[in-house]
């Protein structure tokens, strides 16, 4: 074989053929169309060697099997027919693997996703390592697609239809023990013996067909299948609001295969894959994937990062506890927490304990691994143990004098190279650094709550922050498993600045008489994961509205919230979910009582709660203000590119991913249409909808935020 081949065949002395997968020059193995010739040549050799007792497919990469198909192949397709042909080519290769007369085993270590799992499904048996890096899944739905190389047909027959639907409709990834439990793999072994165990499995021969659990057998029958698909279709529709066509096609294709046979199923799969590849939703989701991949590679600045072995955290509250957890347990860094009392330290330690104990209970990690990770975290009520910290993150109250005091204390008690990162959500970083002896080592690092779940962080340098400080902070964020965007030190930074007008408009709709649940439902239908009123309840009404006066002082009336409404709600001791009452009422913690709108909220703000506007009208008002503010942020260089703006909105506030982010969405609409809608709304509802100068200029020139092949509009 050519040395540049991604697939290499070696026949062992025991007459088992080992096919090593190693895409040249790439960290991850991905399947490309041009590999078809290589694979076919190897399969031909296998068929011609009558002495072979079995075949093992294994990766030569240290931490992945096959991470999926190369998504660029789909982008290169100019029509649904081309994408369908691509799927049929993949199906044919998998069919040839399955048709081999000798037993074929997939030996899996690391990520086995998408086309990688489809290849493993085409093998007769599967074995994987018990390593934390090993995950198996079909995540195509997250790109607006479905598995196109036979996955929709083979998976239901292997693990049962309900398990397969759950995996394919959500894109969820199974850990080794889960994969074994559902029958996706035959064995789970230590990494050190993977190859030998796979060879042994190949020599044993093909296993008898696994008996599915009784429940799965019932659901595979005509009556059970009809009921299952009806129920899943209804549930999926409620979740996607019809915004993701891939989910409907997945259900249709799997049901076709089960009802009419796999041949019809493969045809339906390839056809649906081709059609979905051309949808705007898939294109937008793939753009988000590429943009997030680019952001994760972006070092933040041209400088080399400084040392980063240990981190300090000031404050053991909710944010401090979450930051300590992701730094130690995801980043693997030593963490020292300082709080004014032992209660705060214990709270932060318990936060990590609870997170890790949940993982132990779910058998994601062992107790020994939990203890090892917890050992990275310690605490103190003074600065003992801080002298060698490379970076200190403060997560104390939003009080400028207090944060300036923290800077002074860190400079006094830590090393000269220690970086001070503030988790402020509203205070200017330049003000926090105003009295610093080393202002070049002060930076903002804005996390979102809950820290362990929210993927985005904003990295905020002020005017004199050094390039090395930026690079080191970005490196830390990546270690914590976050997606960092670098934003300017202006009031509200980026995410809160575009979120505030959206929330304010929702409150205005409420004061005009619209119902809470109708406003939330309108924005969920538009594509947000939760509505704006519910979001305010989840964040905490006191916390979520704290930034409004800051933004109003910086940018004027367009950021003013409806007079007295917020004050009335806060004065009535309504903080949202955290104290059980906000716009909604919440049941006792631990009980499964649903949240309900509190009718008293209408009396409190002096309205009747009767809907007048359509869902589309309500969504338009909230979203157009967000788009207008995003365009201003782009113009003022608050964000470095449209790419960062889209990632910030999708990962930070749940802007509908199928629209690609605010800038992709504005490009889809066209600047002229965005301006026309804003001008119409300004005439109806006031000056806050007046389109910004950037949008007016772009509409006049016919410009876009994303230029072909570029990350943003070039000046």
UniProtKB/Swiss-Prot annotation:
A GO-annotated cellular component: cytoplasm
Pathway in which this enzyme or protein is active: Lipid metabolism; fatty acid beta-oxidation
Superkingdom: Bacteria
EC numbers for this chain: 4.2.1.17, 5.1.2.3, 1.1.1.35
Species whose genome carries this gene: Citrobacter koseri (strain ATCC BAA-895 / CDC 4225-83 / SGSC4696)
Subcellular location: Cytoplasm
UniProt-annotated stretches for the region Enoyl-CoA hydratase: 1-190
CDD domains in UniProt: crotonase-like (cd06558)
S-S pairs: none
Free-text function comment from the UniProt entry: Catalyzes the formation of a hydroxyacyl-CoA by addition of water on enoyl-CoA. Also exhibits 3-hydroxyacyl-CoA epimerase and 3-hydroxyacyl-CoA dehydrogenase activities.
Protein known as: Fatty acid oxidation complex subunit alpha
Matches recorded under PANTHER family: TRIFUNCTIONAL ENZYME SUBUNIT ALPHA, TRIFUNCTIONAL ENZYME SUBUNIT ALPHA, MITOCHONDRIAL
Annotated site residues (Important for catalytic activity) in this chain: 118, 140
Main localization category: cytoplasm
Molecular-function GO terms, alphabetical: 3-hydroxybutyryl-CoA epimerase activity; enoyl-CoA hydratase activity; long-chain-3-hydroxyacyl-CoA dehydrogenase activity; NAD+ binding
